[in-house]
């Protein structure tokens, strides 16, 4: 379906064998299960300082990837409708190097869930959250090995921009004084849905007008992105359509648990990650 691996990424960290990626994913899943058991009868941790640094780090990494992907694809003369794997020379290598950081960032983002476990936010560890985190890390191992440049650049470019907004929101939410300015969290989920639709459209444009990019990869990516559209749309409907916030009600009314001035039912699921406000 995918053909031989791309020799240009041979020897890159974590890419030569699938075993490390698979093993780290299993460790991630076991950490959720065992961590919840360990924390069951223990007090939740605050992690305020760690979360501040973590969110800042992911925001800066996302900003680097966004800028570098835009510059490298522009200088490589990338075609927005369809870009093959080997026509931009050094530009393709530059894109591949950024996409390796994108793959590695998906490993780092496993910490999103670990922080939920340590803070006993078990209601936030949903199927959407775990599915998205675990699958992205594994899928991007495949992308880097078979299609590390060309058409693959578009989704990470959009996602890096979304992550700048998302982790900036998380970083600001650590500070109670900033909560009054965080009215825009609902729009992060909307932005993600737009991102998925744009990525699917961009992917299928290479099916309509082929340029030599592997057909099987295009179909697989479109199918995977559709699962995210379905899951995120379901989350959006359940959270913002069926359970609207009633501004006239006092805090704690209608049985809603209020954390830091925000009803728990009004959290977001940006990139599969729901609200990470510090108690």
Curated annotation (Swiss-Prot):
Keywords on record: Endoplasmic reticulum, Fatty acid biosynthesis, Fatty acid metabolism, Lipid biosynthesis, Lipid metabolism, Membrane, Transferase, Transmembrane, Transmembrane helix
Source species, domain of life: Eukaryota
Membrane topology: Multi-pass membrane protein
Localization in the cell: Endoplasmic reticulum membrane
Result when mutating residue 217 to A: Decreased elongase activity toward (7Z,10Z,13Z,16Z,19Z)-docosapentaenoyl-CoA
Parts of the chain that traverse the membrane: 12-32, 50-70, 98-118, 136-156, 158-178, 188-208, 213-233
Primary localization class, coarse: endoplasmic reticulum
Pathway: Lipid metabolism; polyunsaturated fatty acid biosynthesis
Enzyme Commission number: 2.3.1.199
GO biological process: one example: very long-chain fatty acid biosynthetic process
Di-lysine motif (motif): residue ranges: 276-279
Catalytic activity: a very-long-chain acyl-CoA + malonyl-CoA + H(+) = a very-long-chain 3-oxoacyl-CoA + CO2 + CoA; (7Z,10Z,13Z,16Z,19Z)-docosapentaenoyl-CoA + malonyl-CoA + H(+) = (9Z,12Z,15Z,18Z,21Z)-3-oxotetracosapentaenoyl-CoA + CO2 + CoA; (5Z,8Z,11Z,14Z,17Z)-eicosapentaenoyl-CoA + malonyl-CoA + H(+) = 3-oxo-(7Z,10Z,13Z,16Z,19Z)-docosapentaenoyl-CoA + CO2 + CoA; (5Z,8Z,11Z,14Z)-eicosatetraenoyl-CoA + malonyl-CoA + H(+) = (7Z,10Z,13Z,16Z)-3-oxodocosatetraenoyl-CoA + CO2 + CoA
Classification via Pfam families: ELO (PF01151)
Record GO terms (molecular function): acyltransferase activity, transferring groups other than amino-acyl groups; fatty acid elongase activity
Annotated GO CC locations: endoplasmic reticulum; endoplasmic reticulum membrane
Domain description: The C-terminal di-lysine motif may confer endoplasmic reticulum localization.
Biological role stated in the UniProt entry: Catalyzes the first and rate-limiting reaction of the four reactions that constitute the long-chain fatty acids elongation cycle. This endoplasmic reticulum-bound enzymatic process allows the addition of 2 carbons to the chain of long- and very long-chain fatty acids (VLCFAs) per cycle. Condensing enzyme that catalyzes the synthesis of polyunsaturated very long chain fatty acid (C20- and C22-PUFA), acting specifically toward polyunsaturated acyl-CoA with the higher activity toward C20:4(n-6) acyl-CoA.
Family named by the database record: Belongs to the ELO family. ELOVL2 subfamily.
HAMAP family xrefs: VLCF_elongase_2 (MF_03202)
Subunit structure: Interacts with TECR.
Name this protein carries in UniProt: Very long chain fatty acid elongase 2
Source organism of this protein record: Rattus norvegicus (Rat)
Upper lineage: Eukaryota, Metazoa, Chordata, Craniata, Vertebrata
């Amino acid at each position: 379906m995918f053909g031989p691996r791309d020799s240009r990424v041979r020897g890159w960290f974590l890419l030569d064998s699938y075993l490390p990626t698979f093993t780290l994913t299993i460790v991630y899943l076991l950490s959720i299960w065992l961590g919840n058991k360990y924390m069951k009868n223990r007090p939740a941790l605050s992690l305020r300082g760690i979360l501040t640094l973590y969110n800042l780090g992911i925001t800066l990494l996302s900003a680097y990837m966004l800028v570098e992907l835009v510059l490298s694809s522009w200088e490589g003369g990338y075609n927005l409708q369809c870009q093959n794997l080997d026509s931009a020379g050094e530009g393709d290598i530059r894109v591949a190097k950024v996409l390796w950081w994108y793959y590695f960032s998906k490993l780092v983002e496993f910490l999103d869930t670990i922080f939920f476990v340590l803070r006993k936010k078990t209601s936030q560890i949903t199927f959407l959250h775990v599915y998205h985190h675990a699958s992205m890390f594994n899928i991007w191992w495949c992308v880097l090995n078979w299609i590390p440049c060309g058409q693959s650049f578009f989704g990470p470019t959009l996602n890096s921009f979304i992550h700048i907004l998302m982790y900036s929101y998380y970083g600001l939410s650590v500070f109670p004084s900033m909560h009054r300015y965080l009215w825009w969290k609902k729009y992060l989920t909307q932005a993600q849905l737009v991102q998925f639709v744009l990525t699917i459209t961009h992917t299928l444009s290479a099916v309509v007008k082929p340029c030599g990019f592997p057909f099987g990869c295009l179909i697989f990516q479109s199918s995977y992105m559709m699962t995210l559209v379905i899951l995120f749309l379901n989350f959006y409907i359940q959270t913002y359509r069926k359970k609207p916030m009633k501004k006239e009600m006092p805090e704690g009314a209608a049985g809603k648990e209020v954390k830091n001035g925000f009803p728990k039912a009004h959290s977001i699921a940006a990139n599969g990650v729901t609200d990470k406000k510090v108690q």
